[in-house]
Amino acid sequence: MGQTGKKSEKGAVCWRKRVKSEYMRLRQLKRFRRADEVKSMFNTNRQKIMERTEILNQEWKQRRIQPVHIMTTVSSLRGTRECFVTSDLDFPKQVIPLKTLTAVASMPIMYSWSPLQQNFMVEDETVLHNIPYMGDEVLDQDGTFIEELIKNYDGKVHGDRECGFINDEIFVELVNALAQYSDYEDDEDGEDNQDDERDDITKDQDDNMEEKETLPLRKFPSDKIFEAISSVFPDKGTSEELKEKYKELTEQQLPGALPPECTPNIDGSNAKSVQREQSLHSFHTLFCRRCFKYDCFLHPFHATPNTYKRKNNEAANDGKLCGPYCYQLLEGAREFAAALTAEIIKTPPKRPSGRRRGRLPNNSSRPSTPTVNVLEAKDTDSDREAGTETGGESNDKEEEEKKDETDSSSEANSRCQTPIKMKPNIEPPENVEWSGAEASLFRVLIGTYYDNFCAIARLISTKTCRQVYEFRVKESSIIAPVIAEDVDTPPRKKKRKHRLWAAHCRKIQLKKDGSSNHVYNYQPCDHPRQPCDSSCPCVIAQNFCEKFCQCSSDCQNRFPGCRCKAQCNTKQCPCYLAVRECDPDLCLTCGAADHWDSKNVSCKNCSIQRGSKKHLLLAPSDVAGWGIYIKDPVQKNEFISEYCGEIISQDEADRRGKVYDKYMCSFLFNLNNDFVVDATRKGNKIRFANHSLNPNCYAKVMMVNGDHRIGIFAKRAIQTGEELFFDYRYSQADALKYVGIEREMEIP
């Protein structure tokens, strides 16, 4: 046992040495390849320049040389001096005027920044990308600043530990290179011949490195390789994680391989029949249900499956026939569709004879599958025709009335019209084959349109409603039921007013509470079938439940909006009192949802979300650096602009702020207790507004559709051409340190 332990320990040490040596060799080989690529590109560009130069030389040889005008005197020119240019060759002396330029004031220093019109959330930078240059004076005054800055990033500096860098490409090459040892190594005497094998393997790899990299591996690499890599690079994960990563990377390199969790294009030739969740995976992952954008950069969190449920039917079946061969003419079709809808929306099916609630067929949780047979429908029709011939005049009239009703319903119901119009005497084909694209599209639509097979057939456009119905019956035991959210009954008007008043009093109480000054970021709560009590994230953060929360619409913690009929610019408005903008989905009487494309809106408490900013001008300031000026006059409390930038965490703001303090220039603005807006790298023009103890503007953090946003408003009436100032809320020492000049008092 002791010898076995020593042998395994010695083998692990040997594998670590192999990992280090192969890693250094691959890094050196990569540098050589990079140098060869740069050299090749340089030679190619050089050759192109030489060819172009030769063409220009040939053109110049064919042109006529124009004589140069030689000035004799410049004394008549004002503000110039006469200069002579002489040459040692036999060229005549030239007279050149020397013009004197007047002194021009230099422009203020401006660091590069990227303009944007809305906030942009970024991740924390855990690695210092570059050591900022502060000048020799700053380093002489504070020699430990750089050391403290590096400590804030846990000593991680980009490019400092180059030997510890490993990307996906080097990782795959390293595993492939180490796999060669397993092929040559023998379990019994492998340790005794390591040096000889190392020389042979290295020689073979140097000769045929490129060929071996392109060849597929015969067998999966040994676990010893991943254990050795994990021991050398512990921050890259465990051996099992590295093994899974290697499988994923090698599978992506195979020809025709698709990315993970990728479904083939539904319109392509390789379309597959997949379930609804797989077809909508990209939509659910990339779509933001708060700003209704794909790949949102403001809300990086992913929605939970509870947000995928629909609260109502997109197009309920109204019972009208779409044509002479509508699926509703089949026996048991209407009952099956009603039971299906009742199961999905959790409401019992309505019987045609009354309003009593009934159970699902067969007392089961899933709707019963009726016996669908086109031949039976055909026999039934023929029996009806035979009965009509012998039934007398009354039966003839009833048949004509049914026919007229069917024709009128098919003409009136244009929404459910089936795209394939069948002739009266042609039976629909049986055993129709469904392609993968059609089956996948059907499973997607069934979760939206439920029992409206006519609408589904119209969207598929290659199948009739009867074929869609028959396919749904066949898959009734395969498709998982789409459970919708419970249908909420709207409360009575008196209760609604009571909740509005209770919410209004609750907002006032929060304003009076000292702890309400701590504003936290809003995250939608998601606790299905649980009330918003003390365990609700919104209640804990002292935030109201918004329309994005998964709680019930009659939740006591929900903000109900306002019912104002004025401009919503006084504390009489609940939204204005709660420092919120009016929500167009909640505030329906103040005009927040009207005239969305127009600036003339009655509600004055929705300027940030509408982007109703003023025209700003950028110019040098008399106070410090650059300043921002207003082009048009602005009234008191009128919205000017939103302060936009990068949304960073408080920890990231502390790290960046230490650098900004040395530059004596900061664009950090506290958004809430969790995040800060930094307009240093990205922002809009309002970032150039300077600080003043007597400002003409003020900043206000408002809740806008679930997001905290910073609005800049006029503190008084501002005339055209005035520079904009607002209070940075510096301490007295910081104000003297960063802003040495205070603007003169202006009489409004």
UniProtKB/Swiss-Prot annotation:
Annotated region (Disordered), positions in chain: 183-215, 347-428
Biased composition annotated in UniProt, kind: Acidic residues: 183-199
Protein name: Histone-lysine N-methyltransferase EZH2
Record-annotated SET domain positions: 614-729
Documented EC number(s): 2.1.1.356
InterPro entries named among the record's database cross-references: CXC_dom (IPR026489), EZH1/2-like (IPR045318), EZH1/2_MCSS (IPR048358), EZH1/EZH2 (IPR021654), EZH2_SET (IPR044439), PRC2_HTH_1 (IPR041343), Pre-SET_CXC (IPR041355), SANT/Myb (IPR001005)
Catalytic reaction annotation: L-lysyl(27)-[histone H3] + 3 S-adenosyl-L-methionine = N(6),N(6),N(6)-trimethyl-L-lysyl(27)-[histone H3] + 3 S-adenosyl-L-homocysteine + 3 H(+)
Coiled-coil region list: none
Subunit comment: Component of the prc2/eed-ezh2 complex.
GO terms, molecular function: chromatin binding; histone H3K27 methyltransferase activity; histone H3K27 trimethyltransferase activity; promoter-specific chromatin binding
Job description of the protein: Polycomb group (PcG) protein. Catalytic subunit of the prc2/eed-ezh2 complex, which methylates 'Lys-9' and 'Lys-27' of histone H3, leading to transcriptional repression of the affected target gene. May regulate the circadian clock via histone methylation at the promoter of the circadian genes.
GO (cellular component) term, any one: nucleus
Gene3D superfamilies reported in the protein's UniProt record: SET domain
GO-annotated biological processes: heterochromatin formation; methylation; negative regulation of gene expression, epigenetic; rhythmic process
Species annotation: Xenopus laevis (African clawed frog)
